[in-house]
Amino acid sequence: MRKIAVLTSGGDAPGMNAAIRAVVRTGLDKGITVLGIERGFDGLLNGEIFEMTRRSVADIIQRGGTILRTARSEEFKTEEGQKKATDILRVFGVEGLVVIGGDGSFQGAKSLSELGVKTIGIPGTIDNDLAYTDYTIGFDTAVNTVLDAINKLRDTSTSHGRASVVEVMGRNCGDIALYAGLAGGAESIIVPELRFDIDKLCKTILEGKKNGKMHNLIIVAEGAGKANDIAKTIEKVTGVGTRATVLGHIQRGGSPTANDRILASRMGNRAVELLLEEKSSRVVGINDNRIVDMDIHEALSIEGKFDEKLYEIAKALSY
């Protein structure tokens, strides 16, 4: 293995830069040339490829986003686009490709591996929705971003005796809502994995009001409901003033936490090691604080891993 390349694809996540840094510096330490591909698979199709050095990744471990930038590509989803991508990699002499991203990015890596490209995937997505790994890069930072916001919302909700409904990211996975809700002492956590009863929630809010409760904090994953709709219903049924807050893309930004920087560094290092071991079509993950790897087809076939025990703990501590 003499030359490898790295790209970031799909939605950005804090810690991607730390992973890029680890891939580049591990590769250079092993005497490998490392190329950077800008703007994901779209940039690959346009030949946006350059050689990276140690200076290329200096002072980026603390930065959010991705220095390689990211984009989505409709052309790459076609057989012709994937064949074009493999030809471009061959022209540049790339013998191994590291793909940092989420489920869609891994699907792209899988397609390239089936065309003979040696690929390794690193999970970078704030949603934590890849079931084969305990945590994905960016998740911890996103949870802490949400926690900071709900701490502030709790202050103003208490002052006014209101309820706050906070909508966070998570179309199919409620982990951000669950972890931030538990850490922030939310009274209710609404996730796509579990059925939600608005009438029961309103009844609980009324009981709390009768017992002197000064505020209510409800966290909802975007795939489970809309904060504005839930807030309107709560206010109409209970008479309690209720405000909705949609945190949106702020959850993707910001300097990564120590946990995300360390996780990304470990995963990036292992990805290069796997290529040097002549392994391909693998994804890196973490289980029980051990860096592991798995066949990409198997990893993508594993179903969701929602932690119902953690949810029950949050529920027990909520009122």
Curated annotation (Swiss-Prot):
GO terms for molecular function: 6-phosphofructokinase activity; AMP binding; ATP binding; fructose-6-phosphate binding; identical protein binding; metal ion binding; monosaccharide binding. Substrate binds at residues 125-127, 162, 169-171, 222, 243, 249-252. ADP binds at residues 21-25, 154, 185-187, 213-215. Its cofactor is Mg(2+). One of its GO terms (cellular component) is 6-phosphofructokinase complex. PROSITE patterns: PHOSPHOFRUCTOKINASE. Keywords: Allosteric enzyme, ATP-binding, Cytoplasm, Glycolysis, Kinase, Magnesium, Metal-binding, Nucleotide-binding, Transferase. GO terms for biological process: canonical glycolysis; fructose 1,6-bisphosphate metabolic process; fructose 6-phosphate metabolic process. Belongs to the phosphofructokinase type A (PFKA) family. ATP-dependent PFK group I subfamily. Prokaryotic clade 'B1' sub-subfamily. This is ATP-dependent 6-phosphofructokinase. It comes from Clostridium tetani (strain Massachusetts / E88).
